[in-house]
Amino acid sequence: MGHSDSSKTFRILMAGNPNCGKSTLFNQLTGLRQKTGNYHGVTVEKAEGIFHHLDHSVKILDLPGAFSLGGSSEDKQITSRVLIGHEAGDRILFVMDASLAERSLQFLLQILELNVPVLVAVTMKDVLEKKRVQLRLDLLSNEFGILFQYVNPKNGEGIKELKDRIVSPKAFCLPIRSFPWDSERENFLNDLLNSLSTEHSNSLKFVLTNSLKELSGEILQKGLPGLSLFSETPSKLIREKFERFGKRFTYLEELTQKSIYIKKILSNAIVGDPIPNERVLSKADKILLHPFWGLVSFLGIMALVFQALFTWSEMPMDWIESCVRNVGTFVGDFLEEGPLRSLIQEGIIGGVGAVLVFIPQISLLFLFIGILEETGYIARASFVMDRFMGKFGLSGKSFIPLLSSAACAVPAIMGTRTIENKSDRLTTILVSPLITCSARYPVYVLVIGAIFPSKNILGIFNVQALTMFGLFLLGMIASMFAALVFKKTFFKSDSSYFLIELPAYNTPSIKSLALTVFKKLKAFLSTAGQIILFISILLWFLANYPRIDSSLYPNLTDAELKKIQIRESYAGHSGKFMEPVLKPIGFDWKMGIGIITSFAAREIMVSTLSIIYGVGGEESTDDLKEALLKDTDENGKPVWGLSNSVSLLLFFAFACQCMSTLAVVKKETNSIFWPLFLFTYMTILAYSTSFIVFQVWQLFS
């Protein structure tokens, strides 16, 4: 049963059900030797990695999780196409969830029909042990003719042994045919195969077998996964044969036969004394899945997350502030007074450093979202939110992309590919940018930290943290009402049904969490960092030129000269030009400059204010907060008050200030109309909300 290919360089296709530990295992095998991209012609993320072991170089492709070699969503179609259209020499590493063995084996049976060398890594052994049962892998190996091996991706147990197996020439085995198809079906398949050429015979065999599931033949008309691999003549012949004969094999018959076969195998392979009533919900699920208390629990968990963002990040933020200040001082000691020193200290160090200070909060956000995902809570929150979101025209399938937007809208929008219903998917894409993302946090933290008091309510929750949580809730509520409007106008259709199998509770893998935070933080810095650096240098030039003649102001201090310089600069004139439009929502010309630059990326607002207020490398972020509070207009009144600060927060909550988001919307929708529509409606919403709140506030103040 072995596969004798001894090549030291080969490719492995990793397949398995969602939430089976496949991606965690992928991280354990490849570490940091990963790269991401997109599959050709689609926007589905492609995760590839390499690991070296015993003089072997193994390339691993982590395929999207799926339950079968079918499905209508874009990511599941990719899994089908890659596996069915595998390249010569490819091997399949199937990741099987031992706690959901029957479901995993349903998918494995389909993969075995491809006749490709397979090795099975079995996860969730600890879940079985808690139920006091064991899964005998030796019986499964004998039944299918392939090797099964336990591995724990969370703590690394069995990883070395799995690597040894992977590079062993006898590890990946060609399966023996075990599934007992009835003779009538076999005769039909063989008859059809004999009438076609032998090209792609293994893949063709699977396509034909899988086609028997469809009673109506509808999938054949839409394009069965894998059918496009063959030329027009075989495809036409397949359709004709199935029209006359193939339809008599129904999906229910297929499912029933396989289910009986799998249950028979597992009746012998699963041994032990199982805990009675194991299907009864745990005490935690009785609360977390409750229609009311589940929603309350979700809000409470998110409130604690934002509380931690403020309290836990304080020390590392202070440390980064100190580092930025010391770097500015160090560089300044080697440079003479002049434009170059100003550029490096105020433009580069001050501009970029002002955003780097908020890295601890962004990292904590990525960490908390990763923990919620790995523990299995996100799936439960999706279940609870399904009923609530149904009132607004969406299903629980939209919840995970929306919650992912709390980190970044770009991968969240790409994550909507799992939504089969096109109107639901497009609606989710258009409302996802309303969710508070990590790029908004630097602006929120700066303004909230400067304007709102740092005191506790009930001795637990910080006022600033509650304000941040309120902005998160505002984004969620706005996205729901926007979805309702879109579903009642542009996308009038029924929402898709939401079916989900709740995963077992898991202890998060520290290594997997660290890799997740590292990759997301790296992506954030590599994309936003380049834009911030470019805008900071450009803005420094616009804020410092044309130079004023300081001799005309002999009695003014350096700080007063700095104010005049910025006011008379290119940036100052641009802000003054925008001021009539921004004044009704409470913004002065300095805020106007920040608004203009932040349309490239929201976090640039902080860099812009840092440069405009002359906070350079020798200052800290606290000095920027003080500069905001001390700033006065021509009449001596404070520029930054509670009313226009709230107006600014609302503008940033609703405006689409992210070129990357607009770019990915264009790519996902394959249309220029929808990103333009997104930008327009969010800008109008942001301005209108800020205008109403500021004007009403002024009316009653």
From Swiss-Prot:
Residue ranges of every copy of the FeoB-type G domain listed in the record: 9-172
- Which InterPro entries does its entry note? Fe2_transport_prot-B, Fe2_transport_prot_B_C, FeoB_GTPase, G_FEOB_dom, Gate_dom, GTP-bd, P-loop_NTPase
Q: Name one GO molecular function term.
A: ferrous iron transmembrane transporter activity
* Top-rank taxon: Bacteria
Sorted alphabetically, the keyword list is: Cell inner membrane, Cell membrane, GTP-binding, Ion transport, Iron, Iron transport, Membrane, Nucleotide-binding, Transmembrane, Transmembrane helix, Transport
Kindly give the membrane topology term recorded for this protein.
Multi-pass membrane protein
Q: Which terms in the GO cellular component ontology are assigned? A: plasma membrane
Where does the protein principally reside? membrane
Where it sits in the cell: the answer is:
Cell inner membrane
Disulfide bond annotation, renumbered to this chain: none
List where the protein spans the membrane. 292-312, 352-372, 394-414, 429-451, 466-486, 523-543, 645-665, 672-692
- Chain sites annotated for binding GTP: 16-23, 41-46, 62-65
Coiled coil start-end: none
Q: Name one Pfam family in it.
A: FeoB_N
Entry's family note = Belongs to the TRAFAC class TrmE-Era-EngA-EngB-Septin-like GTPase superfamily. FeoB GTPase (TC 9.A.8) family.
Q: What does this protein do?
A: Probable transporter of a GTP-driven Fe(2+) uptake system.
Q: What is this protein called?
A: Fe(2+) transporter FeoB
Organism this protein belongs to: Leptospira interrogans serogroup Icterohaemorrhagiae serovar Lai (strain 56601)
The gene behind this protein is feoB
